[in-house]
Amino acid sequence: MTTQPPQDQTSTTPSLPPHLDPTTYPRTLTSATHNIHLELTYSTLNPTVALEHTSSPAAGANVLFLGTTRNTFEGRAVSQLSYTSYPPLALKSLMSIATRAAEKFDLKGVYIAHRLGVVPISEASIVVAVSAGHRGMAWKAGEEVLEEVKEKVEIWKREEFVDGGMEWRENRERDAEGRLLSSTEGGK
């Protein structure tokens, strides 16, 4: 006769894998060399923190982008978005994008934070902040960083609709103007 080890009677909820457990967040990665700050979090995003991280006496321009949850998608009422990620890969991809942008545009700072879990209507799911010596480089860098994050980073979005339906989507199914990309033009 074999005995089974005693089961923990105090927990009836199965434990989540660490990458899905909000209590293991925020996950961050930084680079002092290029003043890069990256974060994946289940908490509300704070644009003031983003600007504090990218602030530099050598910067004449600071660009801040907030991506927020819309209330409709293709005519369907959206109740909320939900994001998931595999943090080790996502942070590595974010660092690659941020480092490349810092070097290409001579940035003084880069901050990227992406929210995971449920993101209600009107709340931010992504914050991108960059600082540069001049506005032209900052504008270009901010847009390029955002588009590369949407195209390359291991973060997936589930749109949840008021009618009860839901759809998983890649972050990069549409261009900056909202036009649908074909599978050969973009996406993972």
From Swiss-Prot:
Compositional bias segments (type: Low complexity): 1-14
Entry's EC annotation: 2.8.1.12
Example GO BP: Mo-molybdopterin cofactor biosynthetic process
One MF annotation (Gene Ontology) recorded for this entry: molybdopterin synthase activity
Record Gene3D superfamilies: Molybdopterin biosynthesis MoaE subunit
Enzyme class label: transferase
Residue ranges of the region described as Disordered: 1-23
A Pfam family of this chain: MoaE
Biochemical pathway: Cofactor biosynthesis; molybdopterin biosynthesis
A cellular-component GO term for this protein: molybdopterin synthase complex
Residue numbers binding substrate: H134, R135, K150, K157, R158, E159
Subcellular location: Cytoplasm
Catalytic activity: 2 [molybdopterin-synthase sulfur-carrier protein]-C-terminal-Gly-aminoethanethioate + cyclic pyranopterin phosphate + H2O = molybdopterin + 2 [molybdopterin-synthase sulfur-carrier protein]-C-terminal Gly-Gly + 2 H(+)
Annotated keywords: Cytoplasm, Molybdenum cofactor biosynthesis, Transferase
Family: Belongs to the MoaE family. MOCS2B subfamily.
Quaternary structure, from the entry: Heterotetramer; composed of 2 small (MOCS2A) and 2 large (MOCS2B) subunits.
PANTHER family assigned: MOLYBDOPTERIN SYNTHASE RELATED
Function: Catalytic subunit of the molybdopterin synthase complex, a complex that catalyzes the conversion of precursor Z into molybdopterin. Acts by mediating the incorporation of 2 sulfur atoms from thiocarboxylated MOCS2A into precursor Z to generate a dithiolene group.
Annotated HAMAP family: MOC2B
Name of the featured protein: Molybdopterin synthase catalytic subunit
Organism (species): Neosartorya fischeri (strain ATCC 1020 / DSM 3700 / CBS 544.65 / FGSC A1164 / JCM 1740 / NRRL 181 / WB 181) (Aspergillus fischerianus)
Gene this chain is encoded by: cnxH
